[in-house]
Amino acid sequence: MSALLGILGVVLDARFGEPQGWHPLVAFGRLADRLERRFNRSRLAGEADPGVGWRSHGVTAWVLAVLPLTLLAWALAELPYLGWLVQALALYAALGLRSLGEHAEPVALALRAGDLDEARRRVGYLVSRDTRELDQAGVARAATESVLENGSDAVYAALFWFAVAGAPGVVLYRLSNTLDAMWGYRNARFERFGWAAAKIDDILNYLPARLVALTYALLGDTRQALRCWREQAPQWDSPNAGPVMAAGAGALGVFLGGAAIYHGELHQRPLLGSGPQPQGRDIYRALALVRQGVLLWLLVLAGLWAMGWLHA
């Protein structure tokens, strides 16, 4: 991995954001839909029966979706003269730091203006829960949770896998993460077919998530963040989101989690963090935490490069 190319990828994302009009992941999403229609038997059966929707079909679909593009990224990254450009563009396409701010900041602005309906509408672009009945604290909580968790998935984990394996690493991660978002549901349609996508995403996010939790702790209320991570994260249903959100909530000094409505059903989630309910300004604080953490990671990468541990 080139530390300088990693910095270049982050700069490109900060300057240009997501590609306008066309994004590689949009085309990949269409491919994933076609593969799911072809291989997911439980899509037709409408039930997670042992006789249909075998996990092996999900594994096959995952391999067909991810491995050819990962190998293509590896081959292109090895090209003389053009390989460096492929590396930087691969990271740029995988990052979502600027996009995260572009989606979260309007929520905070609407809350500041007292426009709760607009805040609910805006936060609906960030989260999958039902936002129609959220009060101001509920909107701020949903947005803050999304910033902390998506900061891990869409920013830090991409940087991690780019640091480990360059363009093929970040392509492998980003495509796997996208398939988890599309197939990783615990329902009749996807419970068997999406099992591989969900498990692979858990594996790929295991180390990055814990580095992110440590980053949040170092940049916020360290003692409280570490305590929340240790005591509260095991209660969360996701092995990777738990440490990230617990440490992030502790670092910010707010409460996250609690009751939320998903697809018409009330879910009682564990409470994370310590302190008051979040407000609109805490959305900005969460964004600042994510951005400061990215700068810290880039400084660490630059330091490793200066010591000769990473090539230029």
From Swiss-Prot:
Pfam hit, one: CobD_Cbib
Subcellular localization: Cell membrane
UniProt entry tagged with the keyword Hydrolase: no
The keyword Membrane appears for this protein: yes
Membrane topology of the entry: Multi-pass membrane protein
GO molecular function: ABC-type vitamin B12 transporter activity; threonine-phosphate decarboxylase activity
Record-level GO cellular component terms: plasma membrane
InterPro entries associated with the record: Cobalamin_biosynth_CobD/CbiB
Pathway stated in the Swiss-Prot or TrEMBL entry: Cofactor biosynthesis; adenosylcobalamin biosynthesis
Keywords assigned: Cell membrane, Cobalamin biosynthesis, Membrane, Porphyrin biosynthesis, Transmembrane, Transmembrane helix
One BP annotation, GO: porphyrin-containing compound biosynthetic process
Bilayer-spanning residue ranges: 59-79, 81-101, 153-173, 241-261, 292-312
Family the UniProt entry places it in: Belongs to the CobD/CbiB family.
Job description of the protein: Converts cobyric acid to cobinamide by the addition of aminopropanol on the F carboxylic group.
PANTHER family in the record: COBALAMIN BIOSYNTHESIS PROTEIN CBIB
Protein name, entry field: Cobalamin biosynthesis protein CobD
Gene of this entry: cobD
